[in-house]
Amino acid sequence: MNGNISAYRNKITALPATVAANGTFGGNGVESVIGHPNGAQVGYVADGIFKSQAEIDNHATQEGAGLGRIRWRDLDGNGVINEKDQQWIYDPTPAFSYGLNIYLEYKNFDLTMFWQGVQGVDVISDLKKETDLWSGLNIGFLNKGKRVLDAWSPTNPDSDIPALSRDDVNNEKRVSTYFVENGSFLKLRNLQIGYNVPQNFAKKMKMERLRLYLSAQNLLTIKSKDFTGVDPENPNYGYPIPLNLTFGINVSF
């Protein structure tokens, strides 16, 4: 058995003078600013759902506010929700990564496992735009996730999923903490079980060694219970990481 653990940190320390004055905007909230990690994002802070008219009346002026709509936090306290109510909300750098190799033998059997994990990492779960927001990407042939069945409504007032709406009047697809989730995971990257056929039997078949094995890749994923997607390693629209099963034979003559 052997394992490893590693960690790294990154921070932008210098930019061209013409860029450093304002930072660079890479789209989707990504900004390059001295003193902050590369790939970090700014955005709005989602502060729950408006569940009563009193909550709306007592909140800062927010365009699109309504029952069942996401409430944005008034960070500067000026009583109006605008672009100044943004802060750093996302850092793609994990706290640490780790791995564990295990090899076991018992009589003619052997077992190999490789576990790999990432801890303390943020992910942007863009798929929530399809699982939580009916307006989503507004593409007619796309299905919606089953989470929309639990959306806020007068008969489901305890839900934290926005009310169904065809129009995104509250701009709920904006970059915000609503889409930032815990992307920590532990994966069984490789599992192999082997059997060495007894040598006297192998020699009867004119072989020095005969081994049969069954292996699987990406067999198991352990993730945070707070992650709403399928795979925190692939939280958006990428092709799913496949499960591979292989049966093989090793022969020596």
Predicted regions and their residues:
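C-terminal beta-signal and terminal closure region of outer-membrane beta-barrel proteins
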Residues: G23-K51, K146-S159, K173, L219-F253
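Membrane-embedded beta-strand positions in outer-membrane beta-barrel channels/transporters
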Residues: N2, G99-N101, N190-G194, T246-G248
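Conserved small-residue
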Residues: M1-P92, D132, A151
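Outer-envelope beta-barrel architecture signal
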Residues: M1, F96, K107-F109, S184, ...
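Outer-membrane beta-barrel and related beta-rich outer-membrane complex signature
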Residues: N10-V30, G120-D150, I222-G229
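Extracytoplasmic gating/loop element in the C-terminal half of outer-membrane beta-barrel translocons
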Residues: V118-L212
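Membrane-embedded beta-strand positions of outer-membrane beta-barrel proteins
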Residues: M1-G3, M113, L212-L214, I249
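Transmembrane beta-strands of outer-membrane beta-barrel pores
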Residues: I5-K11, Y106-N108, G117-V121, N190, ...
